[in-house]
From Swiss-Prot:
The lineage of its organism: Bacteria, Pseudomonadati, Pseudomonadota, Gammaproteobacteria, Alteromonadales. NCBIfam families: hscB, PRK05014.1. GO terms for cellular component: iron-sulfur cluster transfer complex. The keyword Chaperone applies. This is Co-chaperone protein HscB homolog. It comes from Shewanella frigidimarina (strain NCIMB 400).
Length: 174
């Protein structure tokens, strides 16, 4: 299903999230199961299914990473359940450096400073990835779609690093 069509928004990486939220509320009102309480069982079931589609579509389009994955899936590139590993040597080296830095945080004399530095480093790297991703998703070239897939894989890894850093930070506050 093309969620951009469902929400009547232009397929793009950068979307108007306020417009998306407005369309979501409109669709929810139109397909809400309560509106079909006195209808046939089939109508009730269709309403529940449609509500689930609207909810999934909204969650997909409001999240930049999921939105990018959806854009690629519309082009036949599925990333949601893949196990492909990245072959970018520089990125793999950077991953190792970040992992070492995460492990060293608890041994630092000023762990919060290290945490702040890592958040800043992650943010700068992610910003670069997102800029590249937005450019690649505009292109109709299949090679660019494959490069966009690699950017998404990197961003997924960065999300895991963020989660790990947040867990470490929470552990220090306990």
């Amino acid at each position: 299903m093309n969620y951009f069509d469902l929400f009547n928004v232009v397929p793009a990486f950068d979307i108007d999230t306020a417009l998306l939220a407005e369309r979501y509320r409109e669709l929810q009102r139109a397909v809400h199961p309560d509106k079909f309480a006195n209808d046939t069982e089939q109508q009730k079931l269709l309403s529940v299914q449609r509500t689930a589609q609207v909810n999934d579509g909204y969650q997909t389009l409001k999240n930049p990473l999921r939105r990018a994955e959806h854009m690629l899936s519309l082009r036949g590139i599925e990333l949601s359940h893949e196990t492909t590993t990245l072959k970018d040597g520089a990125f793999l080296m950077q991953q190792m450096e970040w992992r070492e830095a995460l492990e060293d945080i608890q041994h630092n004399s000023d762990p919060q400073s290290s945490i702040d530095e890592l958040y800043e480093s992650f943010g700068e790297f992610e910003s670069t990835l997102l800029t590249k991703l937005a450019t690649l998703l505009i292109s109709d070239e299949s090679a660019d779609a494959l490069l966009a897939a690699d950017q998404i894989r990197k961003l997924k890894f960065m999300a895991k690093l963020h989660d790990e850093l947040a867990r470490i930070e929470d552990g220090l506050l306990d």
